[in-house]
Structures are given as C-alpha cells and as structure tokens.
Amino acid sequence: MKLTRRNMLITSSASAVAVAMGAFPAFASMTDDEIAKLTGGAELGEGAITIDAPEIAENGNTVPIGVTAPGAVAVTLFADGNPLPAVATFKFGPLSASRTASTRIRLAKTQNVVAIAEMEDGTFQKASANVKVTIGGCGG
C-alpha cells in the first residue's frame, strides 16, 4: 500500500474509532453487572411478578411501564439499551396494600425492559418485556 495523505487519514480515523469503541462496555453487560450488584449474585426466579409495557412505543421519550409484584419490598427497573441502565426503584412498606408501581420512562432504542423484585423472604424475581421504539428518546 502506497502511503498517501488520504490513506493516512483513513487509517488514523479508523484507529481512533476502534480505540474509542473499546472504551465503552456493551449496555447489556452493564445491565447484567447492575443486576448482579443489586442481587449480590443471587439466583433470579421468574413468574412471581409481571411487567406491563407496550409492544411498540412510537416515541421513546415517554414509554408507560407498570409492574405488579405481590410480596415485594422493592422493585428496580432496568433498560438494557440505555446509556444508564438503572431507570427507577420503587420501595414498598409493610402496610402497602397493592405492590404495584407505574411510571413513564425514556428509552433510547428498541430494547428489553427488566424488572427485578426483592421479595419479603429475601429472594429475587425477574420479569422482562421487549419494547420496540420507533423514535428514540435519549438523543436517538
């Protein structure tokens, strides 16, 4: 390959992009790390909680999400495609009649929304839903 100014610019630009991309971990692995930190590495059960999310969200700026978690003391929501995956935490007191929570979250792109519930007996339960976003809400 002949060393020209054009080849030098292309090579250096490609190298800079490759180095920059290596500095950022994948968002899904960030979510897994956050969940492991929350649960202390405990095994996650499924089926005891439900997450209510739209299959398709036309605008990622306001996506309605609901969680029903009977017997939970806390529920944390994660969006694995967002730059900061931890979205919200809801805590329930001993006198809470209904262990449900709802909010609107911002999603950058099509991704999984994961709810992790800490139950009264100290175990953890998981529920997830895939939300297809047509217009991203985090600068997308």
Name these PLM-found stretches.
Residues 1-16:
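N-terminal secretory signal peptides and thylakoid transit peptides that target proteins
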Residues 22-55:
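C-terminal segment of N-terminal export signals and the immediately downstream linker at the start
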Residues 61-65:
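Structural beta-strand segments of beta-rich domains
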Residues 69-73:
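Short proline/glycine-enriched turn/loop motifs at strand-loop junctions of beta-rich domains
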Residues 76-78:
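Beta-strand signatures of extracellular beta-sandwich domains
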Residues 105-110:
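Surface-exposed, short loops/turns at beta-strand junctions within beta-sandwich domains
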Residues 130-134:
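Short beta-strand edge segments in extracellular beta-sheet folds
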